[in-house]
Each structure stands twice: as C-alpha cells, then as structure tokens.
Regions:
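N-terminal accessory segment detector
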Residues: 2-293, 304-325, 333-374
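A structural motif corresponding to the C-terminal end of an alpha-helix
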Residues: 297-303
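An acidic-aromatic pocket/loop used at catalytic or ligand-binding sites
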Residues: 328
C-alpha cells in the first residue's frame, strides 16, 4: 500500500471482519469528508454515495467504543465505593455542561439518530445528482457527528476526572485495565508476531490508525485530515489536534469553549509521574489510554509497542508558541523500536518477542458489541 497510484476503494477486510477504505498511504491521510467533497465536485455520484455510507461507518466505530467506555467508567466508580446517589450526581454535573449550541439538552442516542438520518439524506441527494444540496448536507452531517463525538469524549473525560478526584491518580492504571481490555482484545491482539506476520499486521495497524483518526475528526477544522510521513523504518502520523484528547486540552475552537481544565468544566490533568503518562505532568487522562493501550499492554504481552505515542500536554507549546501536535509512530520492524521508548514507560526492552516467547497468558473473548473484528 505504498504505491501512490492506488485508487480509493471501499472493500471487505478479512483481518478486521468488516469493510474499510483502501488506497495509498498518501490517500489514507485525506479525510473521507474531503474525499466526498471532491467526488461531488467531479460529479462522481456513485463513488460519492459509497463514501457517504462509509463516513457513517467510520463514525460508528467511535460511537460504539464510547457506548462501552461510559458504562464501564461508571461501573469502575461503583466498584470502588462510589454510591449510586453520588454517581448520579457526578453524571448530572457532567451532562449539565454538554448542552448543544442551540441550547438543546445533550442526548447521545438522539444525536446518533440524527447522524444516521442525515447520512441517509446525503446519499439520497447524491443519487438525485443534487450537488449543491449534497454539499450543504455533508457539512451538516459532519457537524452533527462532531457534536455527537465531542460530547461523548467530554462525558468520558468528566468521569475520568471524577475517578482521579475520588480515588487518586494511581487509580488510572486500574481504570484503563477495566475499560480498554475489551478494545485490546478486539483490535490489538491481532498484532502479535507469534500469531500473524508483521508485514500483514502493519498494513492492518496502519489502516485502523488512519480510519480511527478520520472518524475522530482530527485537524483544526475537524475534517479528519492529518499528516502522514513514511521513513525508512517507520510511519509517523501527526494530528493538529486529535479530536479527543487534543481538543480536550486545547478547547473547542468551533464552538468557542475552553480547555476542559478551565471553567465551567474544571476537569483535571495528570499532576504526578506515572509510567502511563511517561512520568510527565500535564497529560490529559484521556490521552493516557493511548500509552496504556498502544505501549504498555503490548510491551508486556508481545515485547514491543504497536504504536509509540507522543501526546500533547496541557499548556505546553512548541518553539513557535503553537500548541503541540499529537504524534504516533508505527515501526516497520517492531523488534527494532529504540530502548528509549521502553524506558519512558518504566520497561526494559526484552531479548525475545511475541506472546509465546514471553509466555503471555491467553486473553478472554470480547463481550461487548464491537463492529467486525477490529
């Protein structure tokens, strides 16, 4: 998938058990939103309709994950002594901050219904060759999904902040072990070199990385476009910002709301050094799931990270004074990941790799409704 001449197609992926968007890596960094715009401009009606269907597919992966995370975060609070009444108050306080710009009370299932129905209307307009109306509908659909996605992220973040406030930062690692183990089994267990050839796994790893960040609507205009660089030994993805943790610590430039550490939210970021924040302060709790999921868990299970993550930190800027971008690195040979990336999560690089070589125990099956197999 390094040939820049590959066309964009929507095809079934056997490793993922569902359809995905294929094309060159240069093409993968272009959002599905932008691809639909281009197809409409070119009057490629059939292709535009296919992409419109897939835009909702991308969104559905993110939406489905939050349907698991939110109840699991609530359950973690209950399992650690938070009463039903206190939990209800926590939820009510979070939700009171998530009203939509027009003043409507936030309702996740209703908002997702709007995403689905607006997607259907977009496809109808495309099939009727109504280019101008389809462009306007696409803008509305993207904005409806952004509002849905961002409030789910806010809901999860408010719960994470409540966990830290009541149980301390040390609870974050236990929290993630409860919340993201299903995601690890569903998506990341397939990146074990003792089970699958890395040459095949790397393509799949890159595909789901690109798909996920398009679905999260990364980028300053929240379209899902990002940077992708290929070097001799790795792929580098950069998000400015990512649509979840990056937006959390920057604030919402579209709706004009501040970083979630500021009023009216007042949610926390890491203030203590831990392996899952690279022993740094200012890492948002949401971003620590990437370190736990993509670095720590696979290092402990396979002997290598599946991605090396450099999250932004609250209040930290680059040399120009601009907010720091989030960066992911995926190595073409996972056994060649430099030692420094192990040290910053308190690990030592092993001499053998793969779950069998390390004697890793078997994991259970996924018990939540996820689309496909990853």
């Amino acid at each position: 998938m390094t040939d820049l001449g590959w066309p964009t197609t929507i095809e079934y992926s056997a490793p993922l058990g569902r359809r995905v968007r294929l094309g060159s890596w240069e093409d993968q960094r272009v959002s599905t939103y932008s691809k639909i715009q281009d197809a409409l401009d070119a009057e490629e009606w059939g292709f535009a309709a296919e992409l419109a269907h897939y835009f909702v597919d991308e969104a559905s992966v993110c939406y489905g994950i939050y349907r698991q995370w939110i109840p699991d975060l609530r359950a973690f609070l209950r399992e650690n002594g938070i009463s039903t009444e206190d939990l209800a108050a926590i939820d009510a306080d979070i939700l009171s901050k998530l009203d939509l710009p027009e003043g409507r009370t936030w309702n996740a299932s209703l908002q997702w219904h709007l995403v689905r129905t607006q997607g259907e209307e977009l496809v109808r307009l495309i099939h009727q060759h109504q280019g101008e109306a389809a462009h306007a509908q696409l803008v509305e659909l993207k904005e409806t999904w952004r509002r849905c996605h961002d409030r789910d992220v806010d809901h999860t973040y408010g719960l994470m902040s409540a966990i830290v406030e009541r149980l301390g930062e040390a609870a974050i690692s236990r929290m993630w072990d409860k919340v993201i183990l299903p995601l690890f089994i569903w998506r990341y267990e397939k990146f074990d070199i003792d089970k699958y050839p890395w040459a095949d796994s790397l393509d799949t790893l890159m595909l789901v990385a690109c798909e996920a960040m398009r679905g999260h609507l990364v980028g300053p205009e929240r379209t899902g476009d990002f940077e992708l660089i290929e070097t001799d030994d790795r792929f580098i993805l950069r998000f400015d910002p990512c649509g979840s943790g990056g937006r959390t610590i920057r604030g919402d430039t579209i709706e004009g709301t501040p970083a979630r550490m500021e009023a009216p939210y007042g949610w926390t970021v890491s203030e203590e050094p831990h392996p899952w924040n690279h022993f740094q302060t200012g890492v948002c709790h949401y971003c620590t799931h990437c370190i736990r999921l993509m670095e720590e868990l696979p290092m402990d299970r396979f002997g290598y990270p599946v991605r090396v993550v450099d999250p932004p930190r609250y209040g930290v800027t680059d040399e120009s004074g601009a907010p720091v971008k989030c960066q992911w690195q995926m190595f073409k040979d996972p056994t060649k990941v430099p030692e420094e990336y192990y040290e910053r999560v308190g690990r030592t690089k092993p001499e053998v790799f793969g779950s069998a070589a390390l004697g890793s125990p078997a994991l259970g099956e996924v018990t939540v409704a996820m689309p496909g197999d990853g």
